[in-house]
C-alpha cells in the first residue's frame, strides 16, 4: 500500500510532509507534490504533517479523488525528487480548502 497526495495540495504545496519522509519518495511539480508508489513504505509519517490534509492512504482516498492514485504514479516518474522542506506557495492559504482544483494542476 502507498500514500497518495490529492486535490487540496494543488496551489498550496506545503512541504512539511517531505521533511519527515524516511525514504524521500516525494516528487515536486510547479504547484503540487506527489508520492512515488513504488518507493513509499507506508510508514504514515507524512499524513499528519500535511497542513492541507491532502495525503491519504491509498485505500482511504475519497471516492471523488480516485484519479489521484494514478496521477501520483504518473507524475512521480517525470518530476524531480524533493528531499527538503521549502516555503509553501505564496497564495497557499487562499487555496487551502478550495474544492475541485485539478484544473489548476501545472505539469
From Swiss-Prot:
Residues 2-30, 31-60 form the 4Fe-4S ferredoxin-type domain. PANTHER family: FERREDOXIN (PTHR42859:SF2), OXIDOREDUCTASE (PTHR42859). [4Fe-4S] cluster binds at residues 21, 40, 43, 46. This is Ferredoxin 1. The lineage of its organism: Bacteria, Pseudomonadati, Pseudomonadota, Gammaproteobacteria, Pseudomonadales. Its cofactor is [4Fe-4S] cluster; [3Fe-4S] cluster. Ferredoxins are iron-sulfur proteins that transfer electrons in a wide variety of metabolic reactions. GO terms for molecular function: 3 iron, 4 sulfur cluster binding; 4 iron, 4 sulfur cluster binding; electron transfer activity; metal ion binding.
Amino acid at each position: 500500500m502507498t500514500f497518495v497526495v490529492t486535490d487540496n495540495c494543488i496551489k498550496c504545496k506545503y512541504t512539511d510532509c517531505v521533511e519527515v519522509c524516511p525514504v524521500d519518495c516525494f516528487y515536486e511539480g510547479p504547484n503540487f507534490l506527489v508520492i512515488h508508489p513504488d518507493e513509499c513504505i507506508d510508514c504514515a509519517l507524512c499524513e499528519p504533517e500535511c497542513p492541507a490534509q491532502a495525503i491519504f492512504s491509498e485505500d482511504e482516498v475519497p471516492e471523488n479523488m480516485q484519479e489521484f492514485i494514478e496521477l501520483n504514479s504518473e507524475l512521480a516518474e517525470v518530476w524531480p525528487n524533493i528531499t527538503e522542506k521549502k516555503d509553501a506557495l505564496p497564495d497557499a492559504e487562499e487555496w487551502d480548502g478550495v474544492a475541485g482544483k485539478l484544473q489548476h494542476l501545472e505539469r
